[in-house]
Amino acid sequence: MPTIQQLIRNTRQPTQNRTKSPALKACPQRRGVCTRVYTTTPKKPNSALRKVARVRLTSGFEVTAYIPGIGHNLQEHSVVLIRGGRVKDLPGVRYHIIRGTLDAVGVKDRHQGRSKYGVKRPK
């Protein structure tokens, strides 16, 4: 417990809210170029080969972003749009690639939840 004199000398500092996606620099999305596309394995109770990409952003950051959906066409030098949103079982992956924009095509044969995977309405 501080004394009144200590509180006069320097006041209480409000706790700072840290952003969960610093590479976006307070923007909703950022564009970037894939530097490496690879698969990685998730944390302990889960088992899979998760598709991720190392992306160099226009903000200067290099981040790891998750590629959602089944199958993708991304390779090195692909231009992608990323949004915030972590993948719980992949440590260090705090961003998602947005499907259906720039070089990332939408998921093939997707009929439900299409808006999340960049798929147009089937005729």
UniProtKB/Swiss-Prot annotation:
GO cellular component: chloroplast; small ribosomal subunit
Species, as recorded: Zygnema circumcarinatum
Listed GO biological process terms: translation
Keyword Ribosomal protein belongs to the record: yes
Protein localization: Plastid, Chloroplast
Family: Belongs to the universal ribosomal protein uS12 family.
Polar residues: bias regions: 1-20
GO MF annotations, alphabetized: rRNA binding; structural constituent of ribosome
Protein name according to UniProt: Small ribosomal subunit protein uS12c
Keyword tags: Chloroplast, Plastid, Ribonucleoprotein, Ribosomal protein, RNA-binding, rRNA-binding
Region (Disordered): 1-27
CDD domains: Ribosomal_S12 (cd03368)
Top-level taxon: Eukaryota
Stored InterPro entries: NA-bd_OB-fold, Ribosomal_uS12, Ribosomal_uS12_bac
Subunit relationships: Part of the 30S ribosomal subunit.
Keyword rRNA-binding: yes
Function: With S4 and S5 plays an important role in translational accuracy. Located at the interface of the 30S and 50S subunits.
